[in-house]
UniProtKB/Swiss-Prot annotation:
Pfam families reported for this sequence: DUF480
Organism this protein belongs to: Pelobacter propionicus (strain DSM 2379 / NBRC 103807 / OttBd1)
InterPro entries, A to Z: DUF480, WH-like_DNA-bd_sf, WH_DNA-bd_sf
Protein name: UPF0502 protein Ppro_2903
Family membership: Belongs to the UPF0502 family.
Length: 219
């Protein structure tokens, strides 16, 4: 594809999509909020440590590829939003699946259904499979089905926004992190708490800006 993403660009794009779909009231995202989202320990594979300089560079790359833009909301803090849905004509179910693949790498049908639930509910595995088929049968495919490895019961699916998947090498890379497992109840609670903390931080920052503006009237 013409818009090949590197690892940091993929993480930033995935986070922008995720926050738009899970916490739209705090979207678009500031650079600080986006860095926090990129470095979450839940809903991420692998876990990454990206400072704001790295995130800003990834945003520059996405803006050059016309996949992200500076939001024109008139606020004092610059905020960013993604353009993937508009650029590729993706519907919410497709966007949710692509987002999970960007954030966690190759996954099975069952894993995708469970993990995408927070963004878009799927009634059954057939619904997820239908979305994956649409993404694979596009003029320029966005998803591919990986060969099933020995010892695995199910095949996994991977996004192609980072270029062609080198099958065995890709599988080995993710196997090094350990096999994918379904999120436990504890993982779900941690994910929700982290999202609430991020949202509260954004709200505090907004209140501080209001206070600063108010003080400025008397200076």
């Amino acid at each position: 594809m013409e818009m090949i993403l590197n690892n940091t660009e993929a993480r930033v794009l995935g986070c922008l999509i995720e926050k738009e779909m899970t916490t739209p009231e705090y979207y678009p995202l500031s650079l600080n909020a986006l860095a926090n989202a990129c470095n979450q320990k839940s809903n991420r594979n692998p876990v990454m440590g990206m400072d704001e300089t790295v995130v800003a560079a990834a945003l520059d790359g996405l803006r050059f590829k016309q996949l992200a833009v500076l939001a024109a909301d008139g606020g004092r803090v610059a905020k960013y939003r993604h353009l993937l849905a508009e650029k590729l004509g993706l519907l919410p179910p497709e966007l949710a699946v692509v987002c999970e693949l960007l954030l966690r790498g190759p996954q099975t049908l069952g894993e995708l259904r469970t993990r995408a639930e927070r963004m878009h509910p799927f009634a059954d595995l057939a619904g997820v499979e239908a979305v994956l088929r649409e993404l694979m049968e596009r003029g320029e495919p966005l998803v591919t089905r990986l060969a099933r490895q020995a010892g695995r019961k199910e095949a996994r699916y991977a996004h192609l926004l980072g270029g062609d998947i080198q099958g065995d090498a890709e599988e080995r890379m993710f196997d090094a992190e350990g096999p994918c497992t379904e999120m436990t109840g504890g993982d779900d609670r941690i994910a929700r708490l982290e999202e609430q903390v991020t949202s509260l931080r954004e709200e505090v920052a907004m209140l501080r800006r209001v206070v600063d503006d108010f003080k400025g009237q008397f200076e």
